[in-house]
From Swiss-Prot:
It comes from Bacteroides thetaiotaomicron (strain ATCC 29148 / DSM 2079 / JCM 5827 / CCUG 10774 / NCTC 10582 / VPI-5482 / E50). It comes from the Bacteria. Homodimer. Belongs to the RNA methyltransferase TrmD family. This is tRNA (guanine-N(1)-)-methyltransferase. It catalyses: guanosine(37) in tRNA + S-adenosyl-L-methionine = N(1)-methylguanosine(37) in tRNA + S-adenosyl-L-homocysteine + H(+). One of its GO terms (molecular function) is tRNA (guanine(37)-N1)-methyltransferase activity. The gene is trmD.
Amino acid sequence: MRIDIITVLPEMIEGFFNCSIMKRAQNKGLAEIHIHNLRDYTEDKYRRVDDYPFGGFAGMVMKIEPIERCINALKAERDYDEVIFTTPDGEQFNQPMANSLSLAQNLIILCGHFKGIDYRIREHLITKEISIGDYVLTGGELAAAVMADAIVRIIPGVISDEQSALSDSFQDNLLAAPVYTRPADYKGWKVPDILLSGHEAKIKEWELQQSLERTKKLRPDLLED
């Protein structure tokens, strides 16, 4: 898989992709992450990527020209499954969406900034608009990092223990069951006996029960679908 991220602040996320699972995925050749500085696609001496909005609205708007140049340059080299725009008013990102996007070969993620992008970009070049939550960030860079991480980590081979990824919260619309490690008794705080029993079937039953109980308590909306 290849993910191309277009941003006005590449330094905000470069370090994120050079450590932990994201670095491992790239070292294994299972994922490529390419970060593109939108200012490299400007043609004026000030390398401006924003301008004042028509209508006298507050804030600044990302310009069409550099964004189109960057996207077109990438599309000239390969086909893309989706051109994604990170925006608070997009479709809510969730685990099923991450699962679906992990099957793609090539993705572009355009990070929003300032007041937003010229809407014509959204009308003519963007294929999918995604939000990671009902709140506003300084820019879409953190949202792009969140999405890339969720997508890449479930590519087969990225995580050594694939069952670990498959049992994460939200994979089956349930929150994950509690997990414990040694010591089994710490200051009287004990691990549930069932987990020490070695009885695989009963442990699985306990795991499902815990997942259901936690979901009912913390995220009952997940059980409404």
